[in-house]
């Protein structure tokens, strides 16, 4: 197979049952290119937005990995599986009926910075091996507590007895399964999360996501400029460009143009040097894109 050089992003609508790595392999095959990576794991039992970077755009990995996320989740109170999702084995049941008022009363405790222990059935690496693989082998291990931020939790609808629909806006690294397991404990019961849909990941929204079948048909890759079309481009002279390329300090005052408060691209003769922001009155590199 001859490799085709392509660079940009694909906003994939990941189906339930596929791993994020499965999606990457499919994209490589469809686009006939090797340099492909996803921008934040989505659990096999979850579906929704999985941004995938291709070629030069893989340099944005760290940038997107820290961006906020939005999820819709259906939570089943009174039932617990070992993986806290629909793929696991039922390990506990509780007959307690959970009412909307009980849920609403505890939600404020989970807004803001909170600590959570990710589930053992997860892609977190423990001594180089995935936690989920160790869990399947019944190997005992501990996962460290992590701090995440929940911007908003909204109870949208009671679907049926003990089954509710929620919307969550949160920081990267948040485990929705753990969040609702902890909420259930606060109420005095247990829970599992049979449905998780990621509707937004940073700049990528579910409204523009495409299936792998649609990618197969269109081969459409979003260019970097399409994803960042709202960001300003700042043109600099050769001398400043050389200093930036070599990683030397450039003060904001040396650039003869009003610099935005948000991120911006710096270019020289139509060549993009990278994504920058102003920090401590100087240029702070976010993503270096220059290739000699």
Where are these regions (language model features)?
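Pseudouridine synthase
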Residues: 123, 130, 135, 162-206
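Extended alpha-helical targeting/anchoring segments
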Residues: 122, 126-145, 151
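Acidic, low-complexity central loop/insert segments
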Residues: 63-118
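Accessory RNA 3′-end/elbow-binding domains used by RNA modification enzymes
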Residues: 1-15, 19-42, 46-49, 67, ...
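Short, charged/polar surface micro-motifs in flexible loops or helix N-caps
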Residues: 55-58, 79-80
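Structural signature of FAD isoalloxazine-binding scaffolds in flavoprotein oxidoreductases
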Residues: 62-77, 141-155
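Residue-level signal for inorganic ion chemistry
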Residues: 52, 73, 128, 179, ...
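The conserved catalytic core of RNA pseudouridine synthases
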Residues: 29-33, 51, 140-173, 177-188
